[in-house]
Amino acid sequence: MEYTTKTQIYQKVKKPMLERQRRARMNKCLDNLKTLVAELRGDDGILRMDKAEMLESAVIFMRQQKTPKKVAQEEQSLPLDSFKNGYMNAVNEVSRVMASTPGMSVDLGKSVMTHLGRVYKNLQQFHEAQSAADFIQNSMDCSSMDKAPLSPASSGYHSDCDSPAPSPQPMQQPLWRPW
């Protein structure tokens, strides 16, 4: 009878079993990834690929999904520009329709276009005024944090804020010393 160590048992029995379980888990995850990408892409071609091709295709697909999010974030960061572009496209469309409509009064078209231009200008001025007010408010908030409010007796000069108010000094009493 031959004596077998735990290491030999592990190498003969456990290690192959653990490797089979690991491969089965990997294959299950690859199948899940394959079906998920096929559903999201709307393309069943990935289902017929081998594992390496499927992984490459999944990586490419995920990179493509990552790119539009950056574009969407840039669009969200500039809503006013998006609005301006949309408004101008609408104005151009109105102008085109009025020009191509037979029997359209020139005076009516002129007044409509003047009105649309005036509204656009008012919107721009409102946005600029609001931006300026926000800027002023932010700068005032920052500058007022550093300084104490001026008293009514203050002259209003900057030097009033820098110098601390003179504090009354207590009367010095002679200090008792034992010698």
From Swiss-Prot:
Pfam families: Hairy_orange, HLH. A motif (WRPW motif) lies at residues 176-179. Residues 83-116 form the Orange domain. It comes from the Eukaryota. Keywords: Developmental protein, Differentiation, DNA-binding, Neurogenesis, Nucleus, Repressor, Transcription, Transcription regulation. GO terms for cellular component: nucleus. Its main location: nucleus. Residues 10-65 form the bHLH domain. It is found in: Nucleus. PROSITE patterns: BHLH (PS50888), ORANGE (PS51054). GO terms for molecular function: DNA-binding transcription repressor activity, RNA polymerase II-specific; protein heterodimerization activity; protein homodimerization activity; RNA polymerase II cis-regulatory region sequence-specific DNA binding; sequence-specific DNA binding. Changing residue 114 to I: In strain: NVIII-2, NVIII-5 and NVIII-m15. GO terms for biological process: compound eye development; dendrite morphogenesis; mesoderm development; negative regulation of gene expression; regulation of neurogenesis; sensory organ precursor cell fate determination. Residues 146-179 are annotated as: Disordered. Homodimer. Heterodimers with dpn. Transcription repression requires formation of a complex with a corepressor protein (Groucho). The orange domain and the basic helix-loop-helix motif mediate repression of specific transcriptional activators, such as basic helix-loop-helix protein dimers. Participates in the control of cell fate choice by uncommitted neuroectodermal cells in the embryo. Transcriptional repressor. Binds DNA on N-box motifs: 5'-CACNAG-3'. Part of the Notch signaling pathway. This is Enhancer of split m8 protein. The gene is E(spl)m8-HLH.
